[in-house]
Structure formats: structure tokens, C-alpha cells
From Swiss-Prot:
The N-terminal region contains the highly conserved SGGXDS motif, predicted to be a P-loop motif involved in ATP binding. It comes from Xylella fastidiosa (strain Temecula1 / ATCC 700964). Ligates lysine onto the cytidine present at position 34 of the AUA codon-specific tRNA(Ile) that contains the anticodon CAU, in an ATP-dependent manner. Cytidine is converted to lysidine, thus changing the amino acid specificity of the tRNA from methionine to isoleucine. It is found in: Cytoplasm. ATP binds at residues 22-27. One of its GO terms (biological process) is tRNA modification. This is tRNA(Ile)-lysidine synthase. InterPro entries: Lysidine-tRNA-synth_C (IPR012796), Rossmann-like_a/b/a_fold (IPR014729), TilS/TtcA_N (IPR011063), tRNA_Ile_lys_synt (IPR012094), tRNA_Ile_lys_synt_N (IPR012795), tRNA_Ile_lys_synt_subst-bd (IPR015262). One of its GO terms (molecular function) is ATP binding. Transmembrane segments: none annotated. One of its GO terms (cellular component) is cytoplasm. Its EC number is 6.3.4.19. Keywords: ATP-binding, Cytoplasm, Ligase, Nucleotide-binding, tRNA processing.
Amino acid sequence: MTVSSPFPRIPDPGVPVLVAFSGGLDSTVLLHCLASQPTQRIHGLEAIHIHHGLNENADAWTAHCAAFCTQHDIRLHIARVHVSHNSGQGLEAAARTARRAAFAHTLQHGHYLALAHHCDDQAETWLLRALRGSCDGLAAMRPLTPFAAGHLWRPLLTHSRAQLLDYAQQQHLDWIEDSSNADLRHDRNFLRIHVLPLLHQRWPQATAVLARNAALAAANADLLNAEDAVLLPDLLDPDGALDINALTAHPPARRARLLRAWCARAGAPPLPERGVNIIERELLPARHDSAACFTWSHTEIRRWRLRLYLHRPQPPWPPDWQPLWSGTAPLILPDGGQLHLESTDHETVPGFPHPLRVRARRGGERLILPGRTHSHPLKHLLQDVGIPPWRRASMPLLCDGEQILAVGDALLAAPLVTWLQAHRLKLRWQYHNNTCI
């Protein structure tokens, strides 16, 4: 990159940009380039610096970034984050999680978060993903992706670090050198310091070729993702569960993609390769009444009645939680779900004749359904209506004294049905998204 070389244009001219500014070479060049564009200044240019508190120089780095932004008349957001040392994901990953959360909190709706990843970073990412056996991961970093309320933009992926260094020297820029970038305990540093220089000795264009491979992999992934998006809806029931017979009609490679797409669509953590293997080996061929399960990252995939369900386990409801509910306003449940009455003619909800008790199941409850004279165990009734076992524990019971009037909105006793029909109302139970994704 030279002073006169063209800088990648923002995909949507006129949209404000927030630059992730660490004070290092890459982000300094990116912020300076954008600040040199009068039109971008008019439409909005700000920076954000993350103070991780992990390095003894963190305060000095923050001061450096503040001085740079003051000199160039750029508003700077300083986000001090707490990085957990006991998250179970490693310090580097925990710092990345905290950093992304700060970015998401600051980025405004529709705005762009600009990151200074360059061609060399892309090559390192491609090698790391290849060494980890990640097929879709070979697409590495995308130039533009949705992020939080806006978009994540990487305008420097076609520029090498050498070009950025030339630019910085021509502009007489000062930047921070982070000593942790020389720590060989980190895989990325090892690749940058030892592996890539050897590749360049033999193949001078190695970095550009690896980055081009990432772009080709991204194009192929986009095609496959589009196919997955067409196929997946036909495999889902109204609750979002995956039909096993429909899934197994596809070959194994496509099944793996559909399982991952299903998890991603539901907002679940990425499904690891181990999970795909366990699902293929244990869940898909299990018996009809099997309760087979795969657990990862506080998330479960359970098999039940020829369906696969995504589920996030929740703690049991407090045993003393037994509020009285009038029905005039929604009742928020301990797991974040709710009970409410819905008017079928859009009139004001009148509420019950007297407040009713709401509580969790304790076991052994029985219910008399409309048209029947004898009570039946809730366990059997819930099985009959197809409620998965793990969801039953979070179903609220609506009681009038000792009489059970409703179990969620799946089972209603005759007196409640009569009253609801007379008042043109429906009882609705909305379970929380974290309970069943």
C-alpha cells in the first residue's frame, strides 16, 4: 500500500464506521486511511479501544490511542472489559469473547465495525483452520459479515502487512508493538514467526496463494450454504425439531452440513465434529423410545420419537414459587417463559373469576380431560400429546385449590375449557428460547 494506492470503498457509502483500534500497526493504518477520506468523516467515523487489563502496558496503550484520536479529531470509545481466567476456554479465547461483546455493545444499528485484518492474517487463519480439520473454516475471514446490530467489515484483506508498513512509514505514523505477539505459546504467533517465513523462502507468493484459497473456499461454502438453506426447512417440524427419517434420506456428508446448519439457525454453539460422529453412531440408529443425547457447551441434542431436539438445560424452578395469577396480565415464569390469556376477538382480557395458583410439577399429578369421567396421570397424558420429557419439567400447572385446570397450554380440564370458550379466550404458554432452542 502506498499513499496514492486506492483504499477499499465501504460497501454502503454514507454509513458511519466504527474502527477497532488497538494502536498497533494494522489498526493505526486503517484508522488513518479512513480519517483521510473527507466523505467518511462527514458520514461518521469513530474508534473503539478495548482495555483488557491483561498487560502491564495496557494503560499506556490506552493513552497512546487517545492521543492519536485527539490529534486526528476522532471520537474514541474506551471499553474496559473483564477477562475471566476461569472461563474454561483459555485466556486468549476469553479475551476475544470479551472484546466482541464490547464491540457489539458499542456498534449502533446499521453501522460498520471495521477490523484491520490483512492478507497475512488471512493466510495464518487459513493454516490454523486447515490444521484443525475445519472444512467450512477454510473460508477463513470474510470481508463483510453481519455482526450484532450492524456489519463487520475487513477492508484490508487484499493488502499485505508489508504494504501497511510502507504506508505507515510514508505517513510517519507511530504505533504500539505488543510483546505478546512474540509469545510462541500462541499458535498464530508460531505460524507467523517460524512457519510462514519458511514457506516464503520456497514459495514467495505463499501468503497471497493461501489467502486466495480462503476466497475460493468461501465461494464454495456460500454455494453449499445456499443448498442447505433450501433443504433444511423440509426437515423441520413446527417446533423446530429435526425429522430423523427425512434427515437420513440424505448422504452422510450432507447430513453433517444440515446438522450444523440446524444448530446455527437455532442460535446454538457450533456443532463439533465429535458431535456429528456421535449423532451418526448413537442417536440416529437408536431405538424409537431411546433418550440418547449429545451434550456440548451447555447445549444438548436429544432424540425422541424419530425427532432430534435442541435443548439448553435449565435449573429446576424454586419449590416455593407458587404465585397467584389473575390472568389480566402475562405471568413471567422462573425460566423466562410466560403464561397469558389471548382474546380471540381482540377485546380486553377479563381475567379469571378469582386468582389461580401457578406452580411447577411435583410428580404424581392427575387430570380429568373434557369428555372423560376419570382422571389420568399427567405423565401418560403428556406422552400422548407428544411433549418431550425434558420440556415437561418446565410446564406450569394452573390450579384452583387442589384441582389442576391446565398443564401449560397442552392439557386443559373441562371447567377451564368451558370458561375460556364462554369468554372467547385462549390460554397460551410460551416457553423460553433457552429452554428449547
